């Protein structure tokens, strides 16, 4: 039964399993591919830092915020100023970047340029309206942090020119906070707005900056002395952290809770500056006395005030009055208890007053900057989050403008909205001192709260804050902020508070630390700089200013601030995935933000970037292709058939520009027509010989042209002499010679036209070299050949190859020598008979190849001195050849153009040369007989000279090469020697180290050996004693 039950249960389990969720799960867990997406702003900042203006433009067109700030509050303009990228600075300013945008520590781009010493950027920024009186969270203007004299001079001149009051700018924050605190006190209602990110209040700012007057007024107005920010810091935490003794005393006198802990579990003692720890302990003792006295008196009013909240309108006044009285009594008791401490305090106050006069001035402007910044933050975040809560008409939109422009009547510098601003807005300003801790940066946690919640709180407070305060009473919160900031500034030096990151990073000496802590180190989010706000109002930059906060002088910023400071851009970036639309895809794709549809943007990015790169490469290739094409044109390999040569050329350079193919097509037209009587086998043999004797990359140089012309002259003179001797020997054939001459003269008339084509044919012989040129069967029209020849010559002359004309000259000389050969051949043919003349002429024409000169490796030999001189002349320089050339030309009454004009006059020269060469043997051979010997001697001497010069040049070149090689060899040897020495030293050191280790091992063995020796000695002594005993 039990077995049956078990089986039944098992079957039921199996049935339940089938179709269950677990059964339906796939056996292999599918892992989703992680896709990395970057925020639009991060992509924009990266593009700006890389200097890619095209990419930046595309991002801007796609809706990127040009004033986007990273977690440190740094915008692209800040980064460009730090990187000394003048072009990007100009580009960003031209595209609407806020030139006075502060970062988390109140540094505007001008601060960055001044601290780095970039004069050109500073001049440009000033010219574009940068505020030279801008004060950062430490109370420093660009002039204060300028590194170089030239920069200081520039900024000082600009300050003088604009009439900026630096001291007033520094005190602006405290003055505004005082005004608002008085206004709250008079109105009986505190309408402070917490800072959007830190949750700081005006009381925090006043305590941290040491604005004692503001602090007193705020407490009188009914501020809760134990109010906490988002990180749980009370005003006492701030005052203790920044070392503000007076602020601590005021808070303790007003019975703040000294044991309150923040969210990290730290009391004010834990985060306090080391310098005031003792003072805080004394204050705690006094407060305990006060508490005991009050417990004795059982004063309910004081107890109620201790827990009083900000928004109690009626009770606040009653309790406030008693509060004012009680603290004074308590203060008198405390002072009576410690007169010594009072004296010290007074001295400290004097010191602080001297310092804090400056510090307060700095902090005023800083806290103003904080209020202004934080208020815009709230309003901006409201705008960004599209919160449609209906605030009072005076409160809703004016928050930005009023926050920026509330300087009221006392502020004469900023004539914008003064007393007209609604009290709610002004109070909000003062409340924005909540930003007090933007600069304080205690723990990274304070930046965690979203700006949206802060903005909602701000709006709620705006809606609830209905009390209108008179413009005459300045805000309390501003003065509070100043004092709080002083306290916070001092706290920077606290090194032992582990979880808190000291706000001030660069304290040097104690005095500096005190001053800086009191005024400068507090990085307030410039919620109180109304002056800044008005300037920024004018530049429509309130949003960005609201989002940024100040930092210490260094540009290194903390990341917890970074997280909270940047205003998130809510624009979703549409991505284009198709690679076709290059610009659009570029605009959309490069920055794949978290808001883009997943998967689409990466593809768009790749395609767009690849398109752009492809376009750039193609343009570069187009630039380079023209010379490439020309180069290929000059010396293609010699192909046997005309058609195959053109096709091969076009196919090999298919990737280059179409112009190259066009030129190749043109070249097809200059190829010498194949004669009918020449068989295919003969043509192949000729092309094969041409390929053997010529390098595929060989060109034609000017030197070769000149050599060819001299060679023509020499070969012509030798041939004329031989022909004259033959005529003398064969007088019986003079009639036939005359007939032949007459035929030649008749053909000369037609040749005058054909010689214009002659050069083009000789040029093309560089590609089909050994194919004999039939002047009569040339079918190419002279005009077309001339035009194509001109273009081809131009293309070849553009080449960079030094020997680009070798083929032309050799072919040129070969063409002229062929004419002379033909004349001699025809005379010989006349001897043998006219019936055999045609085939014999072909053979004869083919045989005198040994007299022709190839441009490549010459493979024929002859014993005559003339041909040897011709071979020597291949290496001669161009200068003396020019002389011989002009001589030989002028001898034939042709226009003697210098060889330097060869490129211009080459076409005409070729025709005149060949024509004169043709006529010379027939017309004036006998007349020139006497002069040819002298010419030959002269040419021989010139050839020798040129040969010697060439040899000298070659030897000089070899000498320089050898010297270079020698130097390289010596350097190599030295390096090798050094290396060998080093290696030898290393080997020796290793050997010594081994030796030392061996010796150490031996030393370790030495005690053992000594012990063994001692033992053996003892044994020997014992044995000796035993033996002596036995011997007895």
Curated annotation (Swiss-Prot):
Motif annotated as KVKF motif, chain positions: 35-38
Task: Give residue spans, biased composition: Basic and acidic residues.
Answer: 291-300, 318-340, 422-432, 481-491, 614-625, 674-683, 719-768, 816-842, 869-885, 916-928
Phosphothreonine PTM sites in chain numbering:
443, 697
Biased composition of type Low complexity is found at 383-399, 469-480, 633-661, 774-797, 886-900
Gene Ontology cellular component terms for the protein in this record: A band; centrosome; contractile muscle fiber; cytoplasm; cytosol; kinetochore; PTW/PP1 phosphatase complex; stress fiber
| Residues with the Phosphotyrosine modification | 446
Q: Which UniProt keywords apply?
A: ANK repeat, Cytoplasm, Cytoskeleton, Hydroxylation, Phosphoprotein, Repeat
**Phosphoserine PTM sites in chain numbering:** 299, 422, 432, 445, 472-473, 477, 507, 509, 601, 618, 693, 696, 804, 854, 864, 873, 905, 910, 912, 997
Name the residue ranges with Acidic residues bias.
357-369
Biased composition of type Basic residues is found at 684-694, 843-854
Where mainly located?
cytoplasm
Where in this protein does the record say (3S)-3-hydroxyasparagine is found? 67, 100, 226
Q: How is it modified after translation?
A: Phosphorylated on upon DNA damage, probably by ATM or ATR. Phosphorylated by CIT (Rho-associated kinase). Phosphorylated cooperatively by ROCK1 and CDC42BP on Thr-697. In vitro, phosphorylation of Ser-696 by PKA and PKG appears to prevent phosphorylation of the inhibitory site Thr-697, probably mediated by PRKG1. May be phosphorylated at Thr-697 by DMPK; may inhibit the myosin phosphatase activity. Phosphorylated at Ser-473 by CDK1 during mitosis, creating docking sites for the POLO box domains of PLK1. Subsequently, PLK1 binds and phosphorylates PPP1R12A.
- What are the boundaries of the region Disordered? 290-553, 588-928
Q: What does this protein do?
A: Key regulator of protein phosphatase 1C (PPP1C). Mediates binding to myosin. As part of the PPP1C complex, involved in dephosphorylation of PLK1. Capable of inhibiting HIF1AN-dependent suppression of HIF1A activity.
Recorded protein name is Protein phosphatase 1 regulatory subunit 12A
* Organism of provenance: Rattus norvegicus
């Amino acid at each position: 039964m039990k077995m049956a039950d078990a089986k039944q249960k098992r079957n039921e389990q199996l049935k339940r399993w089938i179709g269950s969720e677990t059964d339906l799960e796939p056996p292999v867990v599918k892992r989703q591919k992680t896709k990395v997406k970057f925020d639009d702003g991060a992509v924009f900042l990266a593009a700006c830092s890389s200097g890619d203006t095209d990419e930046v433009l595309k991002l801007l067109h796609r809706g990127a915020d040009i004033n986007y700030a990273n977690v440190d509050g740094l915008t692209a303009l800040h980064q460009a100023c730090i990187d000394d990228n003048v072009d990007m600075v100009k580009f960003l300013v031209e595209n609407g970047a806020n030139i006075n945008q502060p970062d988390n520590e109140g540094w505007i781009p001008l601060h960055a340029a001044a601290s780095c010493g970039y004069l050109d950027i500073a001049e440009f920024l000033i010219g574009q309206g940068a505020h030279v009186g801008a004060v950062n969270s430490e109370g420093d203007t660009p002039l204060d942090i300028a590194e170089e004299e030239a920069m200081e001079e520039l900024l000082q001149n600009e300050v003088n020119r604009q009439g900026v009051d630096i001291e007033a700018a520094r005190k602006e924050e405290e003055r505004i906070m005082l005004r608002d605190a008085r206004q709250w006190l008079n109105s009986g209602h505190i309408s402070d707005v917490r800072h959007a990110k830190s949750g700081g209040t005006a009381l925090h700012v006043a305590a941290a900056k040491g604005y004692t007057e503001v602090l007193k007024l705020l407490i009188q107005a009914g501020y809760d002395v134990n109010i906490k920010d988002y990180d749980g810091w009370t005003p006492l935490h701030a005052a203790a952290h920044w070392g503000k003794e007076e602020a601590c005393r005021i808070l303790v006198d007003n019975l703040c809770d000294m044991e309150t802990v923040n969210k990290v579990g730290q009391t004010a003692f834990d985060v306090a500056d080391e310098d005031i720890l003792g003072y805080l302990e004394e204050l705690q003792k006094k407060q305990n006395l006060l508490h005991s006295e009050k417990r004795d008196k059982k004063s309910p009013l004081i107890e109620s005030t201790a827990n009083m909240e900000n928004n109690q309108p009626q009770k606040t006044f009653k309790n406030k009055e008693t509060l004012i009285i009680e603290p004074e009594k308590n203060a008198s008791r405390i002072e009576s208890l410690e007169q010594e401490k009072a004296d010290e305090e007074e001295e400290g106050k004097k010191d602080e007053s001297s310092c804090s006069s400056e510090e307060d001035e700095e902090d005023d402007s800083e806290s103003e900057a904080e209020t202004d910044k934080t208020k815009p933050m709230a309003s901006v975040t409201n705008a960004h989050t599209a919160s449609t809560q209906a605030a009072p008409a005076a409160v809703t939109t004016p928050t930005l403008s009023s926050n920026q422009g509330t300087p009221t009547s006392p502020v004469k510098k900023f004539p914008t909205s003064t007393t007209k601003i609604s009290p709610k807005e002004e109070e909000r300003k003062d409340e924005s001192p909540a930003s007090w801790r933007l600069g304080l940066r205690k723990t990274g946690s304070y930046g965690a709260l979203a700006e949206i919640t802060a903005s909602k709180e701000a709006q709620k407070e705006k809606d609830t804050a209905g009390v209108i305060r008179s413009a005459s009473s300045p805000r309390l919160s501003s003065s509070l902020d100043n004092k709080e900031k002083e306290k916070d500034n001092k706290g920077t030096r606290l090194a032992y508070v582990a979880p808190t990151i000291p706000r001030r990073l660069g304290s040097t000496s104690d005095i500096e630390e005190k001053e800086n802590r009191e005024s400068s180190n507090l990085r307030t989010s410039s919620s109180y700089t109304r002056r800044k706000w008005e300037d920024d109002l004018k530049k429509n930059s309130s949003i960005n200013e609201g989002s940024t906060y100040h930092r210490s002088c260094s540009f290194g910023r903390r990341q917890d601030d970074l997280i909270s400071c940047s205003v998130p851009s809510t624009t979703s970036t549409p991505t284009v995935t198709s690679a076709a639309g290059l610009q659009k895809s570029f605009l959309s794709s490069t920055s794949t933000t978290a808001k883009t549809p997943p998967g689409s943007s990466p593809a768009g990015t790749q395609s767009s970037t690849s398109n752009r790169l492809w376009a750039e490469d193609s343009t570069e290739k187009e630039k380079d292709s023209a010379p490439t094409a020309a180069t290929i044109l000059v010396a293609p390999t010699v192909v046997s058939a005309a058609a195959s040569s053109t096709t091969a050329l076009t196919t090999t350079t298919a990737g280059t520009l179409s112009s190259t193919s066009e030129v190749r097509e043109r070249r097809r037209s200059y190829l010498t027509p194949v004669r009918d009587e020449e068989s295919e086998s003969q043509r192949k043999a000729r092309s094969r010989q041409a390929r053997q004797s010529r390098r595929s990359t060989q060109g034609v140089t000017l030197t070769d042209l000149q050599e060819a012309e001299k060679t023509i002259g020499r070969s012509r003179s030798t041939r004329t002499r031989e022909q004259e001797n033959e005529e003398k020997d064969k007088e019986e054939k003079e009639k036939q010679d005359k007939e032949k001459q007459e035929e030649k003269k008749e053909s000369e008339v037609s040749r005058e036209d054909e010689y214009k084509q002659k050069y083009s044919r000789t040029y093309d012989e560089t590609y089909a070299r050994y194919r004999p040129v039939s002047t009569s069967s040339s079918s190419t029209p002279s005009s077309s050949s001339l035009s194509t020849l001109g273009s081809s010559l131009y293309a070849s002359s553009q080449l960079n190859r030094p020997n680009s004309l070798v083929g032309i000259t050799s072919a040129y000389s070969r063409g002229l020598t062929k004419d002379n050969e033909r004349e001699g051949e025809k005379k010989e043919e006349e001897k043998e008979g006219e019936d055999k003349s045609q085939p014999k002429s072909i053979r004869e024409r083919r045989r005198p190849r040994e007299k022709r000169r190839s441009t490549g490796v010459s493979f024929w030999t002859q014993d005559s001195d003339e041909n040897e001189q011709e071979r020597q002349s291949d290496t001669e320089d161009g200068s003396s050849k020019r002389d011989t050339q002009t001589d030989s030309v002028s001898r034939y009454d042709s226009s003697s153009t210098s060889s330097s004009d060869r490129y211009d006059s080459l076409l005409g020269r070729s025709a005149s040369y060949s024509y004169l060469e043709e006529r010379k043997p027939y017309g004036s051979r006998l007349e020139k007989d006497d002069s040819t010997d002298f010419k030959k001697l002269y040419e021989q001497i010139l050839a020798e000279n040129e040969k010697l010069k060439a040899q000298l040049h070659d030897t000089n070149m070899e000498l320089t090469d050898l010297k270079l090689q020698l130097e390289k060899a010596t350097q190599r040897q030295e390096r090798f020697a050094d290396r060998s020495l080093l290696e030898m030293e290393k080997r020796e050191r290793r050997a010594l180290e081994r030796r030392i280790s061996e010796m150490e091992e031996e030393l370790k063995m030495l005690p053992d050996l000594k012990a063994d020796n001692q033992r053996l000695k003892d044994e020997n002594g014992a044995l000796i004693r035993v033996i002596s005993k036995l011997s007895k």
